């Protein structure tokens, strides 16, 4: 029997597969928000797609999602 690839559990929690690629959360939004402007905090809301150049790395880390 062949070996199975392991999923990086930390990456599996951070990325979700969609039809257009992988969804990810914006960085720099979890703490030390007092020095960041409301405009900057507002723009960090929501989900973004992983860049095309990083998709292969995410796919290797999460082969089954």
From Swiss-Prot:
Q: Which GO terms describe its molecular function?
A: structural constituent of ribosome
Q: Name one Pfam family in it.
A: Ribosomal_L35p
Q: Which domain of life is it from?
A: Bacteria
Residues forming coiled coils: none
| GO CC annotation terms, alphabetical | cytosolic large ribosomal subunit
GO terms, biological process: translation
Instruction: Quote the Gene3D superfamilies the UniProt record gives.
Output: 4.10.410.60
What does the similarity note say? Belongs to the bacterial ribosomal protein bL35 family.
Question: What protein is this chain from?
Answer: Large ribosomal subunit protein bL35
Q: Which organism is it from?
A: Psychrobacter cryohalolentis (strain ATCC BAA-1226 / DSM 17306 / VKM B-2378 / K5)
The gene name on file is rpmI
């Amino acid at each position: 029997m062949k070996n199975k690839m392991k999923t990086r559990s930390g990456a599996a929690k951070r990325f979700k597969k969609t039809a257009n690629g992988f969804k990810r959360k914006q960085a720099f939004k979890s703490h030390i928000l007092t020095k960041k402007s409301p405009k900057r905090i507002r723009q960090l809301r929501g989900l973004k797609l992983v860049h095309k150049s990083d998709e292969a790395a995410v796919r290797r880390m999460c082969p089954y999602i």
